[in-house]
Amino acid sequence: FWKTRWEPSIDGWGDRHRTLVTYKETHDGGKIDPVDNVWTGTWRDARPFNPEGPQPENALTGTIFTVNGWRNDPLVVPDEYAAMRFWRNTEIADLGPGERAVLLKGILGHEWDEDLDNGFRPPGLFHLSETTVDNVPYIQDHGSVYDSGTATHHLTLYRHESGALVFGAGTIQWGWGLDAHHDTETGVPPERANSSSTRVGIDPDGPDRNIQQATLNLFADMGVQPATLQQDLVPASPSTDTESPTSAIHVLDADAVL
């Protein structure tokens, strides 16, 4: 979301690339970073004082930040996604017509993304889930103003021209489905939690086996296998479908019958 740059260390040794710098110029509404040809506002900021021009994050990740904190939402997977390879050997794969799976509350949080067709959307990107939530703090501009709105989250996947398989969880808290031990385990924002209690603990509802298995499936399709396998998970094999789809345009005769 925020573009950053490196500077040497400030300890007197001057080691390269030791200090991470951002001026969050988007908030200022102008160029304030003293390095003239480098922008350290939001990647998406398209205003003329950005010397590098807009480079929205979804051009790489497939999704773009729109929902600000604090959110603690479940992930919803309707039956239309049940046949996707991503969900093989999960409860989602067994969904019937009209059914949907509602996965662990907190998977979507504390901030999350959408898939927007903003001119930078990667070609061939497709969805693996669909969750719509009302009354979220929704971005209104280049990264400074938020107001109540409705947003729809999707897990996404696409094949980059380099051959890389790019998965977009579009959420900070995907790890909540993998391991029950994490921060704000009850989903209560730290500023509202009991200051005398620990900030890191065991989520009483986590983890989520569906998320664990789907992640295992994803890694298998990327050519990565676990050294040891959790007992309740199913080994996953990589896809053998390596040919890209093709399309062709044919000119038909005027009297052709289809």
Report the location of each language-model feature.
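Acidic, low-complexity intrinsically disordered regions
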Residues: 60, 65-67
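E1/E1-like adenylate-forming module used to activate ubiquitin-like modifiers
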Residues: 3-54, 59
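Extracellular ligand-binding/catalytic regions of CAZymes and related secreted enzymes
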Residues: 2-22, 29, 68-244
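Low-complexity, Ser/Thr/Pro-rich intrinsically disordered linker/stalk segments at domain junctions
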Residues: 246-250
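Serine/threonine-rich low-complexity intrinsically disordered regions
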Residues: 42, 50, 56, 78-79, ...
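Short, solvent-exposed loop/linker segments at the N-terminal edge
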Residues: 251-258
